[in-house]
Amino acid sequence: EIIKSGGVVVKNVTGYDLSKLICGSYGTLVALTEITFKVLPAPEEGKTLIIHNQRVELALDFLDKSISSSNDISGAIFLPEDSKVAGCVMNIENTFKLNDLKRDGSITAIRIEGSKKSVNQRIENLINELKIKNNNISILETYQSEIFWNKVKSLEFFYKSKNSILRTVIPPSECVNL
């Protein structure tokens, strides 16, 4: 018997969620003959808003406001200034040489991705919402942003740490509860 599942209606008339039932059976109940995936294109543009030299409390406030804003951020991190704090190496002159990052000190980085027009507008909205002075920010263009987030992903900023490093991925809505 051929059964079609998915699309607008996920459940069949019996009330069973066929997708979960099929996945849970590890192929013992059915043979899949046709599978359709929804694939989203890679973002056209990605920029990172860097906010320089703020206290931890202010950085957490920026992160909280940006995550809960309507600007649809795709990444956020606070990197402290002092290597005594979590063993973070934040001498930006030596660690990350790009034309927009020439300052020492702690930084908060917020990534926004999407279409070029949308990204620029959302960055401006975020700057206005957070009430940041322009002399305290840098904006990394797409290629710079990719390099920065690759360094974050590989924990390169923490390479001299003597502490244990734990990388966790959590839903943005749970960040406030940490």
Predicted regions and their residues:
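Noncatalytic alpha-helical scaffold of FAD-dependent oxidoreductases
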Residues: 1-178
